[in-house]
Regions:
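Signal-transducing coiled-coil linker helices
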Residues: 3-43, 51-61, 111-113
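Residue-level recognition of strand-loop junctions within catalytic nucleotide-signaling folds
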Residues: 6, 84, 123-127, 165-166
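Short catalytic/binding micro-motifs of nucleotide second-messenger systems
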Residues: 104-109, 140-153, 186
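Catalytic core regions of nucleotide second-messenger enzymes
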Residues: 114, 143-159, 192-197
Length: 200
């Protein structure tokens, strides 16, 4: 009986040890999941960050081979003016609003990321003719609707640069982003001089 009790105590101790190990492993897994999320997502907007966007782009170029695709650079106009005039909470609100506006104009399979202070990237495929003109108008109209409903003293407006490409596994997406960014730079020359809401 004494020997049986001894083995019973060992079995109980072993069961407790295994339960603790299982709990510890689950905590490690959860921590890794959280760290993985943080490493790929932007905290302010909940969108992918540059690392997450780069990973999605690699997968996209390996699966959507030779389809007509686009990388779009979107930029919140006059973020510095918003921050300097109304404070950083207003700037954060404007950035979150851009995320919602852009997201509302995209499909569920499209990729949207915030990759810098005021810069966003979009990756999508579309065979629609005149896509670039259609998309620019869609974003402009969405901003118009947003600003009409907003009670903020500033306007939220977005400049766009769009680059078309045919994805392949060896596509240099940094080169495509650079082309879109160059067009964005030209587009920003034509933005309004201030985002201060006109007095009625």
């Amino acid at each position: 009986i004494g020997l049986s009790l001894h083995y019973l105590e060992i079995s109980k101790a072993e069961a407790r040890r295994r339960q603790e190990m299982s709990r510890d492993l689950e905590l490690v897994r959860e921590r890794n999941r959280v760290l993985g999320f943080i490493s790929k997502y932007d905290e302010l907007t909940g969108l992918l960050n540059l690392r997450g966007f780069t990973e999605q782009t690699k997968k996209f170029c390996s699966s959507e081979i030779n389809q007509r695709a686009y990388i779009i650079c979107g930029d919140l106009d006059h973020l510095k003016e918003i921050n300097d005039t109304w404070g950083h909470p207003a700037g954060n609100f404007a950035l979150q609003s851009v995320a919602r506006i852009l997201g509302g104009c995209l499909r569920s399979q499209d990729t949207l990321a915030r990759v810098g202070g005021d810069e966003f990237l979009i990756l999508l495929n579309c065979e629609e003719e005149n896509f670039q003109d259609i998309f620019r108008k869609r974003i402009k109209d969405a901003c118009t609707v947003f600003n009409a409903e907003s009670d903020k003293p500033f306007l939220v407006e977005i400049s766009l640069g769009i680059a078309e490409f045919r994805p392949k596994p060896d596509t240099d997406t940094q080169e495509i982003i650079a082309l879109a960014d160059k067009e964005l730079y030209e587009a920003k020359k034509h933005r309004r001089k201030s985002v201060r809401r006109p007095e009625s």
